[in-house]
UniProtKB/Swiss-Prot annotation:
This is Probable DNA-directed RNA polymerase. These complexes consist of double-stranded linear DNAs with proteins covalently attached to the 5'-termini. Its EC number is 2.7.7.6. It comes from Zea mays. Residues 1-26 are annotated as: Disordered.
Length: 1098
C-alpha cells in the first residue's frame, strides 16, 4: 500500500516516549514536593511547563498543561481565567452545535469496526476459514485501494468530493494534462475513480493516529497522488489482460498490452525534476551542484500536480501561508519562508479508515516472491537473496501483483538500503520472524472496561481528553473559538488566537486518537490478534499500524498475551506460581517509578497491595492520584487491576498473561563495552555482573558519566586556580563546575552524551548547551562549557572515539570506491548506499476561485531528489550508528532463535522492540541470560572488525585484476588471507582452556600493518573516482593508526584477560542448545539463575 509515512512504527521511538513520560512523572513528583513545602507560583514570571503543573496541582486542575500554552509573562490569575474560558467553550459548543438537529457524528469509519464486531466470537463460532475470510476483508478495506470500498466509506465527504454540479477530477485532468501517457491513464479511469484515489491518499497521509503530524509536504502529497493513480492503472491493465487471456488465450493479446505503460510506483513529478536536473547539469559546476536548484514549473503538469490543483480548486486543501521574518531594527520584512506544507480544510476524522490493523488470522510466512530476482551477482554478496524479495505477513500481500504489497524489508528505497541473506545460513532470521508474528495476543477486557467506566476521572488527572472533543468539527469549533475570545476582551490581550487555536486542535487530535484507539480495542475484544513483522535495513523489527507494543502507554495497557494453538500442556506448580507472582510484582512497581534494586520495588508494591485491601476507595480515588507521578500510568492501572482480580479469584492466569517489559540497560553502550572489552563500561551498563558490600544494584552509565564529568571539572578548576595564582591580573572566569552542577543532572548528561555515540559534532553539542543555558549564561560561558564537555568526552572516552573513527573512516573509504557500505552479522549482510540529494524547489500552479472569479495561484514544493552519486560524507558519519543498531538487531534475533530451540518454545511468548523485550512474568527471569549469550554469539570483537575491513579493503584488493598486482602479495600473505577468510566464517573463538593459547589465537587474527599497506596501494591503482591523493592517504593513515592501536589493546595480556572475563560473564556455559547433536533443546527453567540480573531490567 501507499506508505503510511505518519503511522509506520519506524517513525516513532518508543524509548523516547517512555523517557518523556518518566521525566514528566519526575517533574510532577518534584512539584508535589514543592507544594508540601509551601512553594507558591510567582505573581508575574516567565511561565514554563513546570509552572503550569504547579498551578494545576495547587488548584486540582491536573490536566492544565493540556490547555494552557507555556511562554509569556502570565500570572496564576491569567491561567485560572483561561481554564474557565475552556470550560465555557466546551459547554457552549456542546449546547449550541452538538445539540443542533443537523449535527451528525462521522460514521464512515464504523464500517471497519462493525465488520469485526458482527463476526466476533460472541455472535458466531468462527472456523479458521471464516477468520481467514474476515482478515482478507479487513485488509481489502484498510490497506489497499479498492474503488467500491472507498466510495461506500465516503460518508459526509461524499458531497465535498463528488458533486454533479462540479467538474469531476477526470474531466479536470483531461483539460489540464498534455502528455499522451498521462491522458491514457486518466481515460482508463471510471467516472469517480480519481476522486476515490484522492480520498484514499489523503486517508493515508492525514491520519487520526498521527499525534505529531498535522500537515503534509506538498511534494509528498503530489508524489503519492501520482503514484497511486499509476498503481491503479497498472491494476486495471493487469485485470484486463487476465480477462482477455482467460477468454482468448495468450495469442490474442495485443503485444502492446503485454507491457504496462507506466513503471510501478514511479511518479511523473520526480521524473520531471530529474529531467530538469539533467538539463541543467552541464551548466552547474561541481561546487554549486550541491546547492539548492530552483526549477520553474514545467509546462506539462503530471497527474499528481493536476490532482493537487483539483483539490485546491475545490477548496478541500490549502497551502500553509508564508512566514515573514522581520528585521528588528528596521521593523520591515527581510525574508519570506514558504513552508511547502498543506492542510486539509475539512475534518480528517471524516476520512475513511486506511491504516493497517492487527490480524485475526496468523500472518502468512515470508516467502521468496516467484517473480523476484532470487540471486544477485556482486563480489561482496555472492549468492545472497535481497530481503526486499520476500512477501508475506498480511494475507493479501501474496495475492496482489500491482507492486504495492509490503515486503519483509520495511525500507522504501530497495537496493539503496537492503538486507541480503543466505537462505540456508539465515534460517534463524526467518524462524525468529515467524515466532514473533505467530504469537497471539488479545485485548485486556478488564482494563478496557475500567477506562470506559472512569473516563471522566482520567480526563481530570490529565491522562485522557474529553470524549466529545473527538466529535468537534474543525470549522465550527474555530468559528466559536474566535467569537468567544472576542467577547473576552481581557483574555484576548493575554493569549493570542493562534496560540489557543493550536491548543484546541491538538486536544481535538489527541481526543480522536484516544477514541479510535478504544474503538480498535472494542472491535478486537473477542479475537486472538497477531502482528506481522517487518525488518529495516539494519535488521531491527517493526510492526505497522497504530495498535501494537511499539505504541504509547494507553495502547500497551490494552494488549495481553494469549496461548498459541500449538502450546504444550502447561502445569503451574508452586515454584512456577511464586516466580510468576514475584516477577509480576516487580514489573508493576516499575510502572509506577524506578528503583535501585528489585527489593525496593517489592517493598513498594507490597505496601500498595495493603492499600488496595484496606482502602475501599483505592480504585475510585487513590489509584488516580498515583498516576500523577507514574512512569507508565495506564500500565500501572492495568497491573493494579490484575492484582485485585488475582486477590479476589486466586486465578494466576490473570497475572500470567499480562506482559512484562524489560529494557536493555543502555544497549548501545553495552555493545560498545563489548567491542572495547572495557570492564568499567560493562559494569556500569550492567552487562558484567559485579557485587559490592551493599549487594548488586542497577547501575546507570549516565550517572557514571555524570560523576566522571564532575571529577574532570574539579581537576580542571584546580589547574585554572593555579594559573590564576601565577597570573593575578587575569580576568576571572565564571566557574564551569558551579554552573554545570547547578543546571546539569543525569537526564541532561544523557541528552548530551547519548548522541555522541551516533556522531554528534562539537557544533551540535554547542547548540544543545545554548538551548540549555538560554538566559542563564553569556556566549563566552556557553563556549567555555561546550569546550569542557567536548574535551571531557575525547579524553575520558578516547578508546570509544577511536572505534567510532575506525568504522567511519573505513566506511568513507568503501563508499569512495563506488561500492555499497557493507556490514555483516552471522545471519545477514546489510547494504547501505547513501546518495547525494539535490535540494529542489519546484513551482506548482493551481486554480482556485475568489469572488466567483478564477484565480491562478503558485506554491512551492521543496524536495530532496536522490542523485546517482554516492554521498561519501553521509556514509562516513552515519555508518557507525547503523553498525551498532545492526548488532542490537542481531542480539534480538539471536535471543528469539535461542527460545525457538527450547523444547517448550511454543509456550514462551516473546515480543522484541529494538533492545526492549516483552514476555510473560513466568519467563522474564530467563531473558537476561539469553540476552548476554546473544551478545556473545556476535563473535570476538576483533573478528567482527576484521570482517568490516575485509569487506571494504582486503577483498576488493585481492579481487583487483590490475596487472601490477600480480606479484604484490607473497605466498605467505595469500595463505594468511585465505586462513583469515576461513576464520571470518566462524566469529566465535573456541575455549582452548589456556590463556597462552587464547592469546596466541587472538594475535594470529590481527591483520599485519604491511599487508594493509599493500592492500591500500592496490586499491589506489584501481581507483577511477577523482579523490585527491592527499585526502586518500590521510584516510589510509588514520585507518591503519587506529586499527593498530585497537589491536594492540585487544591482543595484549590485559586485553586477553578482559576477553576471558567477558566470555565468562556472557556465554551460557551449560549450553546443550548449541551442540550440533542436540535435538531436544533444554528446559527454560534451567536458564533462570534465581537471582536479580539487571543487564536487561524492568
Amino acid at each position: 500500500p501507499i506508505r503510511e509515512s505518519v503511522r509506520v512504527s519506524t517513525d516513532r521511538d518508543p524509548d523516547l516516549e517512555d523517557e518523556k513520560r518518566e521525566q514528566l512523572g519526575e517533574s510532577m513528583q518534584t512539584e508535589l514536593e514543592r507544594l508540601t513545602w509551601g512553594v507558591e507560583v510567582g505573581t508575574s514570571e516567565d511561565i514554563n511547563v513546570d509552572t503550569v503543573k504547579r498551578w494545576g496541582l495547587q488548584n486540582n486542575k491536573y490536566n492544565a498543561e493540556h490547555w494552557i500554552p507555556p511562554g509569556g509573562q502570565r500570572t496564576a490569575e491569567d491561567m485560572g481565567k483561561l481554564y474557565q474560558f475552556w470550560d465555557e467553550f466546551i459547554e457552549t459548543y456542546e449546547n449550541e452545535v452538538m445539540m443542533n438537529s443537523g449535527y451528525r457524528e462521522p460514521l464512515n469509519k464504523d464500517k471497519v469496526f462493525n465488520t469485526l464486531l458482527d463476526h466476533s466470537n460472541n455472535k458466531t463460532n468462527q472456523t479458521a476459514e471464516e477468520l481467514k475470510g474476515i482478515q482478507t476483508k479487513i485488509e481489502r478495506m484498510t490497506m489497499y485501494f479498492y474503488e467500491a470500498n472507498v466510495y461506500e466509506s465516503l460518508g459526509q465527504l461524499k458531497n465535498k468530493f463528488i458533486n454533479i454540479d462540479e467538474q469531476t477530477a477526470k474531466d479536470y485532468l483531461l483539460d489540464k494534462l498534455e502528455k499522451p501517457d498521462d491522458l491514457d491513464i486518466v481515460r482508463a479511469m471510471g467516472t469517480y475513480t480519481l476522486e476515490c484515489i484522492v480520498v484514499f491518499v489523503l486517508s493515508k497521509q492525514f491520519n487520526v493516529f498521527a499525534l505529531d503530524k498535522a500537515s503534509v509536504q506538498v511534494a509528498t502529497l503530489v508524489s503519492e497522488l501520482d503514484s497511486a493513480a499509476k498503481i491503479e492503472y497498472n491494476r486495471i491493465i493487469a485485470e484486463d489482460r487476465k480477462r482477455k487471456k482467460a477468454k482468448w488465450g495468450d495469442k490474442q493479446i495485443n503485444e502492446d498490452e503485454n507491457i504496462l505503460l507506466q513503471d510501478k510506483g514511479v511518479d511523473t513529478f520526480n521524473g520531471d525534476v530529474h529531467s530538469e536536473l539533467d538539463r541543467k547539469k552541464k551548466s552547474i559546476s561541481k561546487q554549486t551542484n550541491r546547492k539548492r536548484v530552483r526549477i520553474s514549473k514545467h509546462k506539462e503538469p503530471g497527474i499528481g500536480e493536476a490532482l493537487f490543483g483539483w483539490l485546491a480548486s475545490r477548496k478541500l486543501i490549502e497551502v500553509k501561508k508564508p512566514v515573514f521574518l522581520f528585521d528588528k531594527k528596521n521593523k520591515k520584512p527581510k525574508n519570506v519562508i514558504y513552508p511547502g506544507y498543506v492542510d486539509c480544510l475539512f475534518d480528517i476524522k471524516d476520512l475513511p479508515f486506511c491504516s493497517t490493523l492487527p490480524m485475526v488470522y496468523p500472518p502468512a510466512d515470508w516467502e521468496l516472491w516467484p517473480t523476484a530476482t532470487a540471486e544477485v551477482s556482486d563480489p561482496y554478496i555472492t549468492n545472497l537473496t535481497p530481503l526486499s524479495s520476500y512477501r508475506g505477513g498480511y494475507l493479501t500481500s501474496l495475492q496482489r501483483e500491482s507492486g504495492d504489497s509490503p515486503t519483509l524489508l520495511s525500507e522504501k528505497d530497495y537496493g539503496v538500503f537492503d538486507i541480503h541473506i543466505d537462505r540456508e545460513r539465515s534460517q534463524p532470521v526467518l524462524s525468529a520472524v515467524k515466532k514473533l508474528q505467530w504469537q497471539p495476543y488479545r485485548i485486556n477486557k478488564l482494563v478496557y472496561d475500567f477506562i470506559q467506566k472512569h473516563w471522566s476521572v482520567l480526563v481530570s488527572v490529565g491522562l485522557l481528553r474529553p470524549k466529545n472533543l473527538a466529535l468537534f468539527k474543525r470549522k465550527e469549533a474555530l468559528r466559536l473559538l474566535s467569537s468567544l475570545l472576542f467577547k473576552h476582551e481581557e483574555l484576548s490581550t493575554i493569549y493570542r488566537y493562534s496560540e489557543l487555536k493550536s491548543v484546541l486542535l491538538k486536544n481535538i487530535h489527541a481526543s480522536t486518537f484516544e477514541l479510535y484507539t478504544m474503538k480498535i480495542a472494542e472491535a478486537y475484544l473477542d479475537y486472538k490478534i497477531y502482528f506481522p513483522i517487518f525488518l529495516d535495513f539494519r535488521g531491527r523489527n517493526y510492526r505497522h499500524g497504530p495498535f501494537h507494543f511499539h505504541e504509547r502507554d494507553l495502547v500497551r495497557s490494552l494488549i495481553i498475551f494469549d496461548e498459541s494453538d500449538d502450546s504444550a500442556a502447561h502445569t503451574i506448580n508452586s515454584d512456577v506460581g511464586d516466580r510468576i507472582l514475584h516477577n509480576f510484582l516487580i514489573s508493576a512497581a516499575y510502572h509506577k517509578s524506578k528503583f535501585g534494586v528489585y527489593r525496593e520495588a517489592l517493598e513498594f508494591i507490597y505496601n500498595k497491595i495493603e492499600d488496595m485491601q484496606s482502602k475501599p476507595t483505592f480504585f475510585e480515588k487513590d489509584i488516580f492520584v498515583d498516576t500523577l507521578c507514574c512512569r507508565h500510568p495506564f500500565q500501572y492501572i492495568s497491573s493494579c487491576i490484575s492484582l485485585k482480580t488475582y486477590a479476589d479469584t486466586k486465578d494466576l492466569s490473570v497475572l500470567r498473561y499480562t506482559p512484562v517489559f524489560q529494557d536493555a540497560s543502555a544497549s548501545a553502550y553495552q555493545i560498545m563495552s563489548y567491542f572495547l572489552l572495557d570492564i568499567d563500561y560493562g559494569i556500569h551498563t550492567n552487562l558484567l555482573k559485579k557485587t559490592n558490600t551493599d549487594g548488586r544494584y542497577i547501575r546507570d552509565i549516565y550517572e557514571f558519566m555524570w560523576g566522571c564529568l564532575i571529577k574532570y571539572l574539579i581537576a580542571e578548576e584546580k589547574i585554572e586556580l593555579a594559573i590564576k595564582l601565577l597570573t593575578p591580573n587575569e580576568k576571572d572566569q565564571e566557574s564551569v563546575l558551579a554552573k554545570i552542577v547547578s543546571i546539569f543532572d543525569r537526564n541532561v548528561v544523557k541528552k548530551m552524551f547519548m548522541p555522541m555515540m551516533y556522531g554528534k559534532t562539537d557544533y551540535t553539542l554547542k547548540k544543545d548547551v545554548e538551548d540549555l543555558l538560554k538566559g542563564k549564561s553569556d556566549s563566552e560561558g556557553i563556549n567555555l562549557i561546550s569546550k569542557h564537555i567536548s574535551t571531557y568526552w575525547k579524553v575520558n572516552f578516547g578508546k570509544m572515539k577511536d572505534l567510532m573513527d575506525l568504522i567511519n573512516y573505513v566506511s568513507w573509504f568503501g563508499a569512495g570506491q563506488d561500492k555499497p557500505v557493507v556490514y555483516s552479522t552471522p545471519y545477514w549482510v546489510t547494504l547501505q548506499t547513501y546518495k547525494w540529494r539535490k535540494r529542489v524547489k519546484m513551482k506548482i500552479q493551481y486554480e482556485t476561485t475568489k469572488n466567483n472569479e478564477k484565480e491562478v495561484k503558485t506554491t512551492s514544493a521543496k524536495m530532496l531528489i536522490p542523485l546517482n552519486d554516492n554521498d561519501i560524507r553521509k556514509s562516513s558519519t552515519s555508518t557507525f550508528a547503523n553498525f551498532i543498531h545492526q548488532k542490537d538487531a542481531f542480539t534480538a534475533i539471536q535471543l528469539v532463535d535461542f527460545i525457538n530451540k527450547l523444547e517448550n518454545a511454543s509456550s514462551i511468548p516473546i515480543y522484541a522492540v529494538h533492545d526492549n523485550f516483552i514476555t510473560m512474568p513466568e519467563y522474564a527471569s530467563i531473558l537476561p541470560t539469553l540476552y548476554r549469550d546473544s551478545i556473545f554469539r556476535m563473535g570476538h570483537p576483533l573478528i567482527i572488525i576484521n570482517k568490516f575491513l575485509f569487506d571494504h579493503i582486503l577483498i576488493p584488493a585481492i579481487q583487483n585484476e590490475h596487472p601490477q598486482n600480480k606479484h604484490l602479495f607473497s605466498v605467505e600473505e595469500r595463505s594468511m588471507l585465505d586462513r583469515m577468510m576461513i576464520d571470518l566464517q566462524n566469529p566465535l573463538i573456541p575455549d582452548f582452556g589456556s590463556v597462552d593459547i587464547t592469546k596466541a589465537r587472538i594475535k594470529s587474527i590481527v591483520i599485519p600493518k604491511d599487508l594493509l599497506l599493500k592492500c591500500f596501494s592496490c586499491l589506489w591503482m584501481s581507483k577511477t573516482k577523482k579523490i585527491s591523493l592527499v585526502r586518500w592517504e590521510s584516510c589510509r593513515d588514520k585507518i591503519i593508526k587506529v586499527y593498530m592501536r585497537y589491536t594492540d589493546d585487544i591482543s595484549s595480556d590485559e586485553g586477553v584477560s578482559r576477553w576471558l572475563e567477558y566470555k565468562n560473564n556472557l556465554e551460557f556455559a551449560s549450553d546443550p542448545v548449541w551442540s550440533s547433536d542436540n535435538t531436544n533443546g533444554t528446559q527454560a527453567d534451567s536458564l533462570d539463575k534465581g537471582e536479580d540480573d539487571y543487564c536487561i531490567h524492568y
